[in-house]
């Protein structure tokens, strides 16, 4: 019988799930790992839910860094931020290969599991790169800069360092409307990740009277050259689903 280990869709829970699956000693071919919510249940499978444990997460992370490489850890972390259903099981299989081959496993793209990890990492990295360019802030009451995004992958912790470096003395928030989480950066302090309640989300979603919104829209429309408009090229470089929270398209 196949045993399926399941957990919440966050990094701590996923690393704990890896720990428990490995410690079960059921055999790598006899287990699968999935993030919740689980869609269709498979027949003849034993499902085991795993709760996040910070100590077990730290143990797994130490093992990855010391027995494989720091590069492999970064690869695993970014793949864990993906929205792909197979990401957790792919991470587990990659770690099995990594503990066998060592640091060079990241170069073994001929191995299907390594290639799949590379694809997950690349997709997440590309999305994070786009959001660094497309994030727009609005000034909320209390002089807090707030931005809303709805990324497919969980890229908040990947884009936050960029804005922490560029806006170190500003109070700002980047809110993931899809996951109800936010990166909060108090002025001249380190940023942190937090979960938002529905009431907090509603309060932070109110329209602001920031005058720079209209100024930016006017600038965007004014610099455009009508004879050179190419909407197909624009959609290729800036997909439509990014535009919901972009000031110039509202």
Predicted regions and their residues:
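Conserved aromatic-histidine-acidic binding/catalytic patches
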Residues: 3-11, 48, 112, 144-155, ...
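Short, hydrophobic/amphipathic alpha-helical patches that form generic packing surfaces
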Residues: 13-24, 93-97, 158-165, 213-221
């Amino acid at each position: 019988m196949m045993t399926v280990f399941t957990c919440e869709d966050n990094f701590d829970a996923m690393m704990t799930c890896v720990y428990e699956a490995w410690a079960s000693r059921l055999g790598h071919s006899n287990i699968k790992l999935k993030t919740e919510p689980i869609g269709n249940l498979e027949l003849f499978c034993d499902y085991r839910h795993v709760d996040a444990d910070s100590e077990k997460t730290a143990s797994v992370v130490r093992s990855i860094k010391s027995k494989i490489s720091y590069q492999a850890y970064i690869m695993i972390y970014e793949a864990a931020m993906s929205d792909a259903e197979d990401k957790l099981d792919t991470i587990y299989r990659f770690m099995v290969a990594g503990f066998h081959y060592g640091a060079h496993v990241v170069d073994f793209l001929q191995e299907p599991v390594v290639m799949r990890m590379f694809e997950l990492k690349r997709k997440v990295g590309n999305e994070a790169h786009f959001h660094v360019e497309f994030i727009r802030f609005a000034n909320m009451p209390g002089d807090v800069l707030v931005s809303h995004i709805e990324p497919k992958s969980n890229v908040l912790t990947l884009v936050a360092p960029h804005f922490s470096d560029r806006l170190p003395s500003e109070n700002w928030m980047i809110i993931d409307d899809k996951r109800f989480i936010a990166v909060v950066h108090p002025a001249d302090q380190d940023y942190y990740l937090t979960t938002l309640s529905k009431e907090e989300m509603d309060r932070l979603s109110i329209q602001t009277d920031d005058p720079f919104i209209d100024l930016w829209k006017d600038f965007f429309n004014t610099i455009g050259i009508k004879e050179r408009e190419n909407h197909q090229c624009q959609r290729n470089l800036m997909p439509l689903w990014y535009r919901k929270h972009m000031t110039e398209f509202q």
